[in-house]
Amino acid sequence: MGFLSKLFGKNNATQSKTGGMEDYMTLVRVYFQAVLATRLGINNLAMLPDLRTYKQTFRVPTLNNKLGPGEKASVRKTMKNIYNVDDNFFDEIDASIKKNCKKMQDIQPYLYQFQGFTQDLMMLVGNLMKFKLRVPGFFKKAIYTMTEKTVNDIYDKNSFSDPGVIKAVMSVRQYNQRLGFSRKWTIDFVYQVVSLAKKEPKPAEEAESK
């Protein structure tokens, strides 16, 4: 959609390259930061840059002088409206943060783990689904089924031959042992990113439009 890109002050050239996938990932980060603020009593917005931008852009009021609860409810509603995200997706993030972030010092290691998890996961998906990703975006059920199989392979299959793939697979499994996301959460997350990526302009299309 690009609406966050516009609201966050990015120029038109940047907007055309961002679109729904970047908006989605931004909102996921906002939700993580809102949960962290709620659980750990963080009131310094400078520590939570994505949450600060979201709060200021959408003028989300602070509830009961506590940063987090109002912003958490707002971004949850936004993601439901735009991406049809279900409650379980948010509940699993809440549970993961509750399990892993007991004190302020836990925040950075946790966020690094999540970043590593998503980067390795999406690299693997791109590698393992590279031919399947040519399926047109309107075949939603087929894309979901292929995503489900790929994620199941990442967690279950032990016969990969490429050393880089093997290393990334082991990394994803180790990250998720700590993060604690269910397989369905991972499948839904990957499916959303893949679906949004398919809607974005290809480099050739961007060149033609210039």
Give the residues covered by each predicted segment:
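Leu/Val/Ala/Ile-rich N-terminal alpha-helices, chiefly Sec-type signal peptides and the beginnings
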Residues: 7, 12-53, 59-62, 68
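Alpha-helical oligomerization segments
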Residues: 174-203
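General "foldedness" signal
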Residues: 38-41, 81, 183
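Short acidic DE-rich linear segments
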Residues: 202-210
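Long, low-complexity or tandemly repetitive, helically biased scaffold regions used
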Residues: 52-177
